[in-house]
Amino acid sequence: MSKIRTRYAPSPTGYFHIGGARTALFNYLFAKHNNGEFIVRIEDTDIERNVEDGAENQLYNLKWLNIFADESIWNPTQSGPYRQSEKLEVYQKYAYQLLEEKKAYRCFCTPEELQKHREDLLKQYKPPIYSRKCFLLSEEQIHKNLADKIPFTIRLLLRDNKEYSWNDLIRGNLIFNTSSMSDPVILKSNQIATYNFAVVIDDHDMKISHILRGEEHISNTPYQLAIKEALGFKDEFVYGHLSIIVDETGKKLSKRNLAVEQFVEGFRKKGYLAEALVNFIALLGWSHPDNIEILDLPTLVKSFTIKNLSAAPSFFDIKKLNWISSEYIKNMDDVMYLAFIKPYVDLNEYDEIKTKVNEICLMFKNQLQYGYQINEIIKESFVPHVGLSNLDQADLDFLKSNPNYRQLLISFKEKINQLDQVNDHNVKEIINWLAHQIKLGDLVLEKPLGGKNLYMPLRIVLSNKKHGPELNKVIALYDKQTILKNLDDAINYLTNAK
């Protein structure tokens, strides 16, 4: 059996979409599982729609995902070129060869004529199949049109009532008859090859064996088989068409839906781990034979088989991505985690705690789903400057609601004052001591005090928040002087409020 060679062939007309990432990943996994080779080539013949850095964006983000091509514009071999724009003469040679062999013909129809013909057929509830008007032109008329420099395309002449079929790796046997197909344009009037024509030549030149691609390419396949046949290529391309990816409403995921992040670049900038994103993408239409869901790239390579691909629509579930991502973050050791998360942290507004970056990052490790989320959580958990002036009337009323709160703050202040250095361990000991003293009755209080009534006054006074991480860890972020000042301010307020 010859070596398995797969390919990912994006058009640089946009940035790296999650659907393209899945196509690339599945081709990569299939090749590597079978000790084969994975090729990336750029289909850049749609000059008007090409994005300036589209090709580089695709390759850069593939590299970020750790999907490395054995051959590409970055590491070419003799199978290249890897940009279609560098093979225009090759495509032209093949197109004119088919013209000479009477397997193709010139079409002088204008876009307006073709559009009208299409509309007329649709009004008659007929399939919009080209009429072959130009195939019926006489040699004299063709020569006259050429002499008059009338623009033309080249169309492949399909065989009448010919069936093209293939055993799709995912969908089984599929059959198309040329009675429902138009003679396809293979060379446009600007002498640039069409997608279907160029892709067959590229797959042949690069010795591609297996082609995994999106469901939308099913209708292209019979045309490509017809082109392959006309060119006399003996390649036995094996096709597999992946499931569509749908959103939460069941509709096909649309790039126009800006409410849903769909581009790899966006996930990278938000701080998703590449390993987590690859893991998530792999589960869009494929499942592990043992239904395992946390799978790193080596495990995916080892486990990936075609039989576990599904033709059913794949649900793009951002909640599942966030869960997978959080699992990867939790499983990082602290050194790796800090190296990952610290570049995202912005504590510029938080002067009192901005030197405690490591402590803050570790505090939220088990809550994070992606890197940039750390700032959202910081904003929810802290205020830029802790002080009595930040408290709203409801907070102040709460502090005044129980006469024991003042004594609690005084006792806590006395213990903090005795410390040489404040850290989360000795703060926790003080909180536990207070709870124990209250339980034993050694702390003189007017009313019973415990649970929420023990922690809430301290949290409000020392963090200005009602909820947040473990109280001892929050308090320990601040220096001793700041803690004592905030306690004094609250005690004085409650003393004067009596």
From Swiss-Prot:
Q: Where is this motif: 'KMSKS' region?
A: 252-256
Q: Which GO terms describe its cellular component?
A: cytosol
Q: Where does the chain bind ATP?
A: 255
Enzyme Commission number, as recorded: 6.1.1.17
- Please tell me which stretches of this chain the record labels as motif 'HIGH' region: 10-20
What is one process in the GO biological process aspect for this record? glutamyl-tRNA aminoacylation
InterPro entries xrefs = aa-tRNA-synth_I_cd-bd, aa-tRNA-synth_I_codon-bd_sub2, aa-tRNA-synth_I_CS, aa_tRNA-synth_I_cd-bd_sf, Glu-tRNA-ligase_bac/mito, Glu/Gln-tRNA-synth, Glu/Gln-tRNA-synth_Ib_cat-dom, GluQ/Sye
Write down the Pfam families for this protein, in alphabetical order. Answer: Anticodon_2, tRNA-synt_1c
Note the PROSITE patterns from the entry.
AA_TRNA_LIGASE_I
Write out the coiled-coil annotation as residue ranges.
Answer: none
- Protein origin, superkingdom: Bacteria
This enzyme catalyses: tRNA(Glu) + L-glutamate + ATP = L-glutamyl-tRNA(Glu) + AMP + diphosphate
Broadest EC class assigned to this enzyme = ligase
Reply yes or no: does the keyword Nucleotide-binding apply: yes
A GO molecular-function term, please?
zinc ion binding
UniProt keyword Methyltransferase present: no
Task: Provide this UniProt record's keywords sorted from A to Z.
Answer: Aminoacyl-tRNA synthetase, ATP-binding, Cytoplasm, Ligase, Nucleotide-binding, Protein biosynthesis
Query: Where does it reside?
Result: Cytoplasm
Q: What does this protein do?
A: Catalyzes the attachment of glutamate to tRNA(Glu) in a two-step reaction: glutamate is first activated by ATP to form Glu-AMP and then transferred to the acceptor end of tRNA(Glu).
Its family remark reads: Belongs to the class-I aminoacyl-tRNA synthetase family. Glutamate--tRNA ligase type 1 subfamily.
Q: How does it assemble?
A: Monomer.
Q: Tell me which HAMAP family the record gives.
A: Glu_tRNA_synth_type1 (MF_00022)
For this entry, the protein name equals: Glutamate--tRNA ligase
